[in-house]
């Protein structure tokens, strides 16, 4: 399977890139600049592509992103602190983001004669993001089968769609993913904040996987409070 991986530079997509490079044929990484405040993640995608010796392309869709207003990831809206599964995290939804990126990726994959587009959506995303759920993945595959009928037969490869973040950490370790060379924090500062939903989820995932977290957090202990508050 010749696969094009959508890679943000985050833990999930970098782990997926290493998985595909080991198990299949990785033909390249595709990233998107949609005006996200944590744009520094794109640099980690570039590092991953260089490490795996594959082409890396960043697609500029900032004009599109400017029209998807109201999200804490793109607008002047505070990124909330707390657990990823809290209702407050819905402010991080960028409407139709994955659908837009996947549609572009399928077009690129078809032009490059690839067999698959790989995406790292996972089970932990289901609560907040509708375009990360299994039903969406299945529906998008059906739509692309019609969109490319007679031209290309491309599979949407989403191996993590029913896996937890901890599962991805465990599998990423198996494929020697350099977790320190990935970026998760939505606030986009010099260091991982340790308080936003993605930082809390990241720290919790390493703990559940029983693997040492190499990440440098500004607040390394907040995740415990976030988990306790959610469980209360």
UniProtKB/Swiss-Prot annotation:
Q: Which GO terms describe its molecular function?
A: ATP binding; ligase activity, forming carbon-nitrogen bonds; zinc ion binding
Per UniProt, the cofactor note for this protein states: Binds 1 zinc ion per subunit.
What Pfam families does the entry give?
A: QueC
The pathway it acts in is: Purine metabolism; 7-cyano-7-deazaguanine biosynthesis
Residues annotated as binding ATP: 7-17
Q: Give binding positions for Zn(2+).
A: 185, 193, 196, 199
Alphabetical UniProt keywords: ATP-binding, Ligase, Metal-binding, Nucleotide-binding, Queuosine biosynthesis, Zinc
Q: Does the keyword Flavoprotein apply?
A: no
GO BP terms? queuosine biosynthetic process
Q: Which reaction does it catalyse?
A: 7-carboxy-7-deazaguanine + NH4(+) + ATP = 7-cyano-7-deazaguanine + ADP + phosphate + H2O + H(+)
Xref: Gene3D superfamilies? HUPs (3.40.50.620)
User: Required cofactors, per record?
Assistant: Zn(2+)
Give the EC number: 6.3.4.20
On whether Zinc is a keyword of this UniProt record, the answer is yes
Q: Tell me its family.
A: Belongs to the QueC family.
Q: What does this protein do?
A: Catalyzes the ATP-dependent conversion of 7-carboxy-7-deazaguanine (CDG) to 7-cyano-7-deazaguanine (preQ(0)).
This chain's protein is named: 7-cyano-7-deazaguanine synthase 1
- Its gene name is queC1
